[in-house]
Amino acid sequence: MRKGILEYCILLIINKKPVYVSDIISELKEAHLIVVEGTLYPLLSRLKNGGLLSYQWQESMQGPPRKYYELTDAGRSFLQELENAWNDIRHTIEKVSVDNTIAVVQ
């Protein structure tokens, strides 16, 4: 499940604007999702190979050129599907949890 959530969060971040890997890691860290580059790069590669992401090289003032990722049209469509699925899951959980309290056994 974490993989699906991580993928969803990454696509949400990239949907805002083209981003560099360290920007993705920083945003995930702020959201308390700790991810290392060794996890992120294969996932980005899989999303790119699946036609959901593209990238462009941009010059950097602080070193070598950087690869900035952005969503393709297919990526935006897939993100919308994930958004719909997430909303369905959230709605289901809310329905199940209404007036549900956890009993404490004494």
Model-derived features: where do they sit?
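Basic, amphipathic "hinge/linker" alpha-helix immediately C-terminal to the N-terminal HTH DNA-binding motif
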Residues: 61, 65-83
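Basic amphipathic alpha-helical segments that dock to polyanions
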Residues: 40-42, 46-47
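Conserved catalytic-core motifs of GNAT/GCN5-like acyltransferases
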Residues: 56-60
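Glycine-centered, phosphate/nucleic-acid-interacting loop/turn motifs that mediate DNA/RNA or nucleotide
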Residues: 51
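N-terminal helix-turn-helix DNA-binding core of bacterial DNA-binding proteins
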Residues: 1-39
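A cross-family signal for key residues in well-ordered alpha-helices
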Residues: 12, 45, 54, 80
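Amphipathic alpha-helical dimerization/coiled-coil segments
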Residues: 77-106
